[in-house]
Structure formats: structure tokens, C-alpha cells
């Protein structure tokens, strides 16, 4: 029944206590929009959600990280740091310890360089890999159409991302940079997402 469906718990729990207190977690079919100003730790945030203790990968979720802004090796390095509690300098100095600590989540995390790719490509990857969680870093750069109005571009890509989440029963986490209008504000809205 509809009442039973609304009582479903989220399949994947957040591992960040302050977030977990406000949001139960995520499940297939969810589109999660995450926005922040430049150089504020967006990639480290999703690395922590996925790879740190009790993160989605530790819970058994198959996670795909589609990176189109930073080099995929830099993104992967953040995940290694998050899962090992080691800086990259410490990882280089003790690769065997880093490998041992990263191993429990390594099979559940796949990285793909997505530079220049669009939402149709994202859908083909999701269809083939069948992930539980997809991270789009950065979501707006996957837009297949371009318009003078960034809201039109973002809306089309976000609708496609939402449809992917529903059709393939995965959670899609859409990372986005926020415009200067969002600087120092706590009351944010979708119009502040850059396209």
C-alpha cells in the first residue's frame, strides 16, 4: 500500500553524525543535490560519505564516481585518504598500510574520468555497471544541451539524472558549485547552482 511504501527506511545511511540527525539516508530513486562555493571541500565531502568509516562503500553499496572537473587520480586520492585516515604523504610513505586500510572498500568504489561526457553517457555507464550510488562530480558539466540560460541547461540535466535514479534504482548525488550569490548564506536555493 501507499502507507507501507512511505514507511520504507533508507537503504544507505549517512556516516556524518550532523547530517544523519537531519536526513535518514538515501535509497535507489533518489536524486541528491549538493552545492557549495569553490574550494570548500565538495570532493572531500563525497569521499567521506562513500569511503570513510561506515560510509556507503562500507555498508556494501556499489559506488561509481564520475569525475569531470578534477583529474580522476586526484579524486581517487581523496577517497584513499578518507578510507585510510592517512594524508597522501603518509600513503606514499607506507603504501602497504594504506592498501590494507583501503582494501575493505576498494571493491565497492569505481572511478571514471568523465571529462566532456554527457548525461546519455552517464546513463550508459549506470545501465552497464548497475551501481547503488552514482556521484556526479560536477553534475552541471554533464549537461547535454547548452543554453544562454543556465537554469534551462541545469533543469534538463537534473531531470535526466532523476530519471536515471528512478529507472535504474540507484541514488544519484549531483555535486554543484554555487554562485557568488550563495557566499556566506545559509538560506540557499537551486537558482544559486552554476551551470
Residue ranges and their predicted role:
Residues 1-85:
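The Walker A/P-loop phosphate-binding site
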Residues 12-17, 116-117, 187-191:
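Short gly/ser/thr-rich secondary-structure transition/capping motifs
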Residues 24-26, 55-58, 101-104, 126-129, ...:
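Conserved catalytic network of the ASCE P-loop NTPase/AAA+ motor domain
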Residues 25, 39, 156-195:
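Phosphate-binding/switch region of NTP-binding enzymes
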Residues 30-32, 63, 131-136, 170-174:
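Generic beta-sheet signal
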Residues 43-44, 151-155:
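Non-membrane alpha-helical structural segments and their capping/turn regions in soluble enzymes
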Residues 49, 122, 161:
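Aromatic/hydrophobic pocket-lining residues that form π-stacking "cages" and hydrophobic walls in ligand
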Residues 59-148, 156:
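Conserved inter-motif catalytic segment of the P-loop NTP-binding fold
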Amino acid at each position: 500500500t501507499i502507507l507501507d511504501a512511505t514507511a520504507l527506511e533508507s537503504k544507505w545511511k549517512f556516516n556524518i553524525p550532523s547530517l544523519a540527525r537531519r536526513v535518514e539516508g538515501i535509497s535507489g530513486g533518489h536524486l541528491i543535490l549538493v552545492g557549495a562555493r569553490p574550494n570548500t571541500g565538495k570532493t572531500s565531502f563525497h569521499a567521506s560519505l562513500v569511503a570513510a568509516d561506515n560510509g556507503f562503500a562500507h555498508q556494501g553499496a556499489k559506488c561509481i564516481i564520475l569525475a569531470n572537473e578534477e583529474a580522476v587520480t586526484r579524486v581517487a586520492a581523496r577517497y584513499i585518504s578518507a578510507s585510510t585516515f592517512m594524508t597522501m604523504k603518509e600513503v606514499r610513505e607506507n603504501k602497504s598500510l594504506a592498501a590494507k586500510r583501503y582494501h575493505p572498500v576498494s571493491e565497492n568504489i569505481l572511478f571514471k574520468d568523465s571529462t566532456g561526457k554527457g548525461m546519455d553517457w552517464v546513463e550508459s555507464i549506470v545501465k552497464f555497471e548497475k551501481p547503488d550510488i552514482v556521484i556526479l562530480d560536477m553534475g552541471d558539466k554533464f549537461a547535454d544541451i547548452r543554453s544562454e540560460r543556465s537554469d534551462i541547461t541545469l533543469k534538463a540535466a537534473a531531470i535526466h539524472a532523476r530519471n536515471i535514479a528512478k529507472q535504474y534504482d540507484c541514488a544519484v548525488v549531483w555535486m554543484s558549485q554555487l554562485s557568488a550569490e550563495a557566499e556566506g548564506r545559509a538560506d540557499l536555493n537551486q537558482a544559486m547552482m552554476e551551470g
